Amino acid sequence: MCGVVSFHGLLGSPGNTHGASIKAKILALHGFDDPMVPVEHVIAFAQEMTQAKADWQLHTYGHTMHAFTNPVANNPQFGTVYQPDADRRSWLSMQNFLAELFV
């Protein structure tokens, strides 16, 4: 595997990467207002990727909750809301990431 993309992932550590290096390039696309991912998890993700010597990126979209790429997501109380700007931007980010992988 040469690359991985996460759209509104939970970013929690699986707890099995200590001491291992991550060879795949990583792109995480995240909504800043996602109530399912506490800021501590974002920081822990960054630390874990750095410790594993991964080639990683984290793109964070402001005013954006969980499920921002799902056009039928419309439940702000649950924290899942479609955000068309973040959807479009994250799709472009993924396309650029994949283009870099397969040059």
Where are these regions (language model features)?
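Short alpha-helix in the alpha/beta-hydrolase fold that links the catalytic acid
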Residues: 38-48, 57
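Short beta-strand/loop motif that positions the catalytic acidic residue
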Residues: 22, 28-30, 34, 61
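Primarily recognizes the serine-hydrolase "nucleophile elbow" in alpha/beta-hydrolase
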Residues: 1-23
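Short, well-ordered secondary-structure micro-motifs
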Residues: 16-17, 39, 70-72
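Acidic catalytic loop of the alpha/beta-hydrolase fold
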Residues: 33-37, 66
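C-terminal catalytic histidine-bearing segment of alpha/beta-hydrolase fold enzymes
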Residues: 50-103
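Structural recognition of the beta-strand scaffold that forms the well-ordered cores
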Residues: 3-6, 27-28, 58-60
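Short, proline-enriched alpha-helix->beta-strand connector loops that line the catalytic pocket
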Residues: 21-26, 52-55
